[in-house]
Structure formats: C-alpha cells, structure tokens
C-alpha cells in the first residue's frame, strides 16, 4: 500500500482544483457522468447506479454504494456495521454490502454436509442475512458457493426458515423503506 500523502502528490490537478484538496472526488464526477448520460438517453427512466466508490453528494445522482468485495468471516460482518454508519454520517443514505461476504474461505467452499465448517457457514450467512434485512439495500452476493437460501441450507431447516422469515419481513417493510427513500429525496 502506498502512503496517502505520496499518492496525493502523484495526482495532477483536477477540474475542481488541486488534487490534494479534492482527492477521491472521482466517484462524484463518475456518478454525475453516468446519471447525466442515462438521463439524456432515457429521460423518463429512473437511474440507479451501484458503485463501490463513494464521495459526499453522490446520492443526488441516484447512486448507492456497497462496501466492496469483502471476506466471509465474522469480523467482516462486524465491520459492515461501522461501514454503514460511516456511509450514513457522510450523507450517503443508500449503501449495501455483499451479505455473506464476497470472497469465500476455502474451508467453506469445501465443507461437507454435517461438518463444523458447513454449520458455521450457515450460521454466518443466517446472521448476516438478518442484519442485511434492516439495511437500506438488501443484497446477497458473492463468489461460489451460491447465495440463494435454498443453496445455503436445506428447505425446512432452521437456517432456511430464518432466512425465509427475514426475506418476508423485508418485503413487509418495503412501504416504510420507500417512504423513507422519498423523504430522503424530497426533504
């Protein structure tokens, strides 16, 4: 990893001014360009951009941020709580994560039915799913193994039933979520 001050020194001036003042503002300009381009082609369609880069103010371009390709460990799930709070405190109301983590440990990929690793994989995904149901965007995504609930746990199992419950709860919360989204946009 390169020192941040060295990276800033390597950057040339930006359209807005010196790179040291506007470092990382690329995300805002990128979101604006995509938004304006989509609106110019299809002015009556809603634009939605999901990006891993973030900068204050990008929400005005219908942009949501996700925390990137994170690992599949308990500490990775824990880190998403502070990541979400940081997004929100930065004025970015729409954020998400790869529920269950993106980069899966080999022990989970190779787990056999009845193994401790498979039990832990299911528990981790279940807890992450429960947390994700209350986040602004509910998105289960990642590398193999597949993330559909029927691929994580057998139908009828406690893990499956829990994940199904939180999926249904999320849909029950949609009027509330849409109302908050509208309030965020208009107020």
Language model features with spans:
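Catalytic-domain carbohydrate-binding cleft regions of carbohydrate-active enzymes
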Residues: 1-187
């Amino acid at each position: 990893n390169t020192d941040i001050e060295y990276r800033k020194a390597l950057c040339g001036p930006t359209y807005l001014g010196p790179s040291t003042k506007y470092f990382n503002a690329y995300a805002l300009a990128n979101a604006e360009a995509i938004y304006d381009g989509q609106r110019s082609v299809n002015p009556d369609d809603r634009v939605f951009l999901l990006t891993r880069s973030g900068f204050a103010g990008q929400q005005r371009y219908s942009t949501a941020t996700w925390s990137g390709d994170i690992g599949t460990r308990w500490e990775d799930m824990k880190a998403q709580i502070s990541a979400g709070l940081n997004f929100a405190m930065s004025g970015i109301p729409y954020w998400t994560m790869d529920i269950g983590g993106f980069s899966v440990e080999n022990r989970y990929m190779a787990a056999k039915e009845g193994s401790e690793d498979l039990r832990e994989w299911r528990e981790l995904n279940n807890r992450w799913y429960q947390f994700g149901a209350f986040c602004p965007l509910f998105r289960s995504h990642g590398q193999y193994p597949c993330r559909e609930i029927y691929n994580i746990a057998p139908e009828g199992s406690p893990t499956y039933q829990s994940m199904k419950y939180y999926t249904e709860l999320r849909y029950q919360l949609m009027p509330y979520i849409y109302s908050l989204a509208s309030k965020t946009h208009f107020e």
